[in-house]
């Protein structure tokens, strides 16, 4: 790492979805995405839905190639992780400028998705699945 990259301005954001937590850093650069030390497309298995979710906040503001995205993410699966990264990137972009908040909010990138796995209840097989009923 050279001295110019050490002095570069870094914007932080944290995102969550299901059981996933992502810590996102935005650094002025060329639009490269690195997730847990691996290239973003490799980490997300080249899945276009996951890749577009990660890039969505940057494309909303027209900054797709302006910042490098460095991510540490843990917990959950790829769906939860990609949406957590999306929210973390959006929050980091709000740190960049206050004017970025309104377009990101209207697109829904700043809102936390509250859906999570429902707990299993006693007397049932799963969260809502009852055991087979026998009349006789």
Swiss-Prot record:
Gene3D superfamilies documented for this protein: 3.30.230.10
Record flagged with keyword Coiled coil: no
SUPFAM superfamilies: Ribosomal protein S5 domain 2-like (SSF54211)
A biological process term (GO) from this entry: translation
Keyword Kinase (UniProt): no
One Pfam family recorded for the sequence: Ribosomal_S9
Biased composition (Basic and acidic residues): 103-116
InterPro entries given in the database record: Ribosomal_Su5_D2-typ_SF, Ribosomal_uS9, Ribosomal_uS9_bac/plastid, Ribosomal_uS9_CS, Ribsml_uS5_D2-typ_fold_subgr
Record-annotated membrane-spanning stretches: none
Region (Disordered): 103-136
Compositionally biased region (Basic residues): 117-136
Record GO terms (molecular function): RNA binding; structural constituent of ribosome
Superkingdom per UniProt: Bacteria
Keywords on record: Ribonucleoprotein, Ribosomal protein
Homology family: Belongs to the universal ribosomal protein uS9 family.
PANTHER family, sorted: RIBOSOMAL PROTEIN S9, SMALL RIBOSOMAL SUBUNIT PROTEIN US9M
Name listed for the protein in its UniProt record: Small ribosomal subunit protein uS9
Record organism: Prochlorococcus marinus (strain SARG / CCMP1375 / SS120)
